[in-house]
């Protein structure tokens, strides 16, 4: 597909413009016939429907959808020339733009993707990372590689695709190696309950073995915990009682049980920016840093401390 075809097929064939915003003195209580003053701020407006997506300063450089998709393709080309366009979406009315490109010949149990996300509301700069989709359950996991390195919107913007590609290539290798390790590491009952307690942000004073006590957690929290445990049981049954199965239990919950169909029908925004993303990131950090963290705590758990 050409760039123009991608924009059209993805309903991203619209542009944004920066327009000055005006204000009045507060005591006028919005009098349309009174004098208006330039506020010093600008609105970022879609040119097709006139919707204001965000507010910015004069220094902010708006980025067009065409540029975002083109930069994503440049990054993917620098990482691995053997890629295909997968999808592009406008999130939350176009406030953010998401582009995903599939790395061909991924093989194995999951497909691998490069993703790029940028904003039209000024909330983030161009950010990037690696995602994977487990074929058996369609669980998606998005891991950013750009934290602290996102590309800001300035007139001299330079995405430095080669440098970004090095970050992503290193992340691809690291993720693959960690997943291999997860598949060969058993998940104990303690690890499961520790993950549940951590991702659900239950009080640290709660004993993992007593989470179900109605006097300790609310009914709503108990129902959420029970649903997460059901998802973990499903995935560990299918994928084995391993940390890989445990991780997929969490991602199954965030992918298939947490929903906001009105704002996020694709389910992508929640996996990138909302609590679902935080839960996945917490679970990933826990299982990939198992070592002494789990071992020391499990000894206390087994000793009844």
Where are these regions (language model features)?
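Generic structural hydrophobic/aromatic packing signal, biased to beta-strands
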Residues: 44, 99-101, 116
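A generic structural signal for short, non-catalytic loop/turn and secondary-structure boundary residues
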Residues: 37, 92-94, 109
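Intrinsically disordered, low-complexity regions enriched in serine/threonine
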Residues: 1-30, 89, 104-305
């Amino acid at each position: 597909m050409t760039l123009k075809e991608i924009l059209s097929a993805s309903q991203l064939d619209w542009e944004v413009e920066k327009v000055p915003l005006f204000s009045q003195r507060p005591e006028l209580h919005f009098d349309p016939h009174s004098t208006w003053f330039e506020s010093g701020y600008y609105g970022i407006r879609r040119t097709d429907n006139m919707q204001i997506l965000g507010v910015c300063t004069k220094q902010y450089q708006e980025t067009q959808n065409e540029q975002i998709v083109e930069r994503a393709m440049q990054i993917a080309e620098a990482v691995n020339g053997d890629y295909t366009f997968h999808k592009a979406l406008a999130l939350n009315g176009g406030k953010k733009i998401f582009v995903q490109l599939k790395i061909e010949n991924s093989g194995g149990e999951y497909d691998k993707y490069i993703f790029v996300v940028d904003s039209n509301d000024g909330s983030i700069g161009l950010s990037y990372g690696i995602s994977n989709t487990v074929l058996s359950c369609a669980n998606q996991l998005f891991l950013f590689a750009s934290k602290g390195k996102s590309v800001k919107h300035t007139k001299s913007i330079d995405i430095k695709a080669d440098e970004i590609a090095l970050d992503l290539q290193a992340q691809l290798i690291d993720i693959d190696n960690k997943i291999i390790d997860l598949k060969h590491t058993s998940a104990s009952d303690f690890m499961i309950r520790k993950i549940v307690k951590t991702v659900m942000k239950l009080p640290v004073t709660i004993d993992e073995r007593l989470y179900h006590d109605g006097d300790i957690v609310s009914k709503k929290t108990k129902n959420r915990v029970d649903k997460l445990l059901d998802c973990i049981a499903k995935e560990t049954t299918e994928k084995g009682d391993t940390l890989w199965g445990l991780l997929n239990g969490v991602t199954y919950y965030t992918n298939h049980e947490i929903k906001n169909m009105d704002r996020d029908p694709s389910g992508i925004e929640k996996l990138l920016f909302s609590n679902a993303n935080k839960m996945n990131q917490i679970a990933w950090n826990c299982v990939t840093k198992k070592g002494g963290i789990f071992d020391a705590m499990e000894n206390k758990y087994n000793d009844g401390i």
